[in-house]
């Protein structure tokens, strides 16, 4: 018989739906084959259908309750994730507020009392703010930072004014002829020595802070890499968990189906046992409708195996869920460690180093950059929150799409199984009807048109061909989807490796070395300068070639990967188009199948009506035969005995054939299920081996990465030690050159003093030497009014600007490089 399952919205029946709405009808109507024993009346038929419908409804209610419990667990997990995200947001906000308090405290400790705005709100208050309140709070924070930096700049300006006053006082003392010049020189030397000591101390502290920041940045990158690996592992585990859910749901449906069949078989067996005392004709009709045999041992073993497989799948799903929870806890602990490291980096720098680390000139230049950096960080925080919300929405949409796809595949599989069952049911019903037709033809000489049987055979053949085409199309679509997924995963891995290579590569910008011409003081200095330029030229040439080679390799790799991405995008578009066409064809095929099913239903209804008419005619003939039997009782009794014996023999033969057919069908079904179970077990074993191989490959890559990081650290330490040795040698050489120059000047001065005859000539010579010290050594005409902040050599501003504009950005005395922010004007 046919069972109609109405799952419309609001309890609407299928009869109320319009006849032309095929899509809605296909969604609401579902056919399922159910084997029932023979019945004596219409009421018994209705009662059996109601019982079967109630069993099916119980199955659906069980499945829906399990789905509801799964969705509730997912909701709780999503709530926990939301709480972790909110806690991370509060941690980030608290870090920013502590940074602002630290800046305020530093400005207050160094420069006295500062007018401060009200204290910043807590993280929970910020979480409950509106967008306008949050923007106003950000503006006030920016104003607080601006006031702090203004006060810091004012203090630095006061310090520079004090130094300027000191220099002016020295000028006045130098202009006074009564004062001794040696005392002034001693004061200047002491002041210069103190400043140089302070500068050396600041440089050492800056180097230390930079090295610490570099180490912390490396640790942060390492933690980020670990985090990305764990996220990918979580995604893989989620996919495996979804597959396990799908398999458990499938096995649960099969188990419910087999349990319902067992119940029906037991009911049929009990019904046959109670009806054994009835008439022989009714008993033969019941046996023709259903053999009523209890379930065999093979079917019970199959059901037990399916139940054990279902329990195993549930245990695997529980273990995987526990692993996911463990990884989530590890991620939370890692996030807490990262926040602690950030707090340690912010609190490790002492206040004395911050207060004495920079001068007024550098602070004035970098003030605008600090404000822009703060704004950028605020924008980045907003972008991160927006991106987090977008990722959540994308993930939810993706989960919905995946659930819809799973539902579609389940419906397609159910539809195929229903077609398969209807095919077997129709074949069995056709054989039973053929036997009934032969018996009725022998008794009452009734015939059925051969055209109806031909039409039913044609429909069965069409259903078989449609089933084969649908299976081939489904296999083709699955193969295409697997190929596209493999290509997509390969492209992702290649992009990830390229990004890692770009992050690990170090690009060192090099400046062109310019040839500087200086006056040869003596023969030794000229030879030394020429050798130094030659060595520097050779070193710069090698570095440039290496840099060019690296740039070419990187550009080539990027171009290759971009082309591969374009080709993959095109293939993906082609695959989506093919999938759309296949889905359209599948919908057309489904519509045709539904039309054929409706036609078959109409034919079955007509056949039932014909059978009812035949039964009525049979009853009338029986009454007539009873009236006539009074006249010829003996003859009819003998004839009836002969006929009943022949009928019993035929019925026994038919029962044997039916039992053989049922046994063959059960064996075929068992073979099909066993082959499917073996195939699933093989697939699970292959996937398990693949996951193990991937885990081994991941461990090997991790070992390689650790080894490369250790080698990189060794090379960095070696490079730092060598660079420090080179800088110390360079500094010693510069000091020796300066001492040599001072000795030469003293020697020339002593020589000139010996040659001078009177005291006036001595004073003139001293004045001339003082003018030479105050004039620019490059142009010999203009006074010294500009200082190099790296080497502290004095020149005129015009000479330094011409050197900067002509790209000869090296100090004429020590050949040290300088930039736009490395020279400043002074007043002597």
Curated annotation (Swiss-Prot):
The protein's annotated pathway: Protein modification; protein ubiquitination
Single GO MF descriptor: zinc ion binding
Positions of the UniProt region annotated as Disordered: 1-25, 269-304
Coiled coil: 53-92, 185-251, 311-345, 460-616, 660-756
GO CC terms in record: HULC complex; membrane; nucleus
Zinc fingers (RING-type), renumbered ranges: 776-815
Entry EC no(s): 2.3.2.27
Biased composition regions of type Low complexity, renumbered to the chain: 269-298
Reaction catalysis annotation: S-ubiquitinyl-[E2 ubiquitin-conjugating enzyme]-L-cysteine + [acceptor protein]-L-lysine = [E2 ubiquitin-conjugating enzyme]-L-cysteine + N(6)-ubiquitinyl-[acceptor protein]-L-lysine
Residue ranges of the region described as Interaction with ubc-1: 1-309
Location within or outside the cell: Nucleus
Keywords for the protein's UniProt record, in alphabetical order: Chromatin regulator, Coiled coil, Metal-binding, Nucleus, Transferase, Ubl conjugation pathway, Zinc, Zinc-finger
Pfam family, one: zf-C3HC4
PROSITE patterns reported in the protein's UniProt record: ZF_RING_1 (PS00518), ZF_RING_2 (PS50089)
Main location: nucleus
Any one GO biological process: glycolipid metabolic process
Record-stated family: Belongs to the BRE1 family.
Subunit-level organization: Interacts with ubc-1. Interacts with mrg-1.
Function: E3 ubiquitin-protein ligase that mediates monoubiquitination of 'Lys-117' of histone H2B. H2B 'Lys-117' ubiquitination gives a specific tag for epigenetic transcriptional activation and is also prerequisite for histone H3 'Lys-4' and 'Lys-79' methylation. Involved in regulating stem cell proliferative fate.
Name this polypeptide is given: E3 ubiquitin-protein ligase bre-1
Gene source species: Caenorhabditis briggsae
Gene: rfp-1
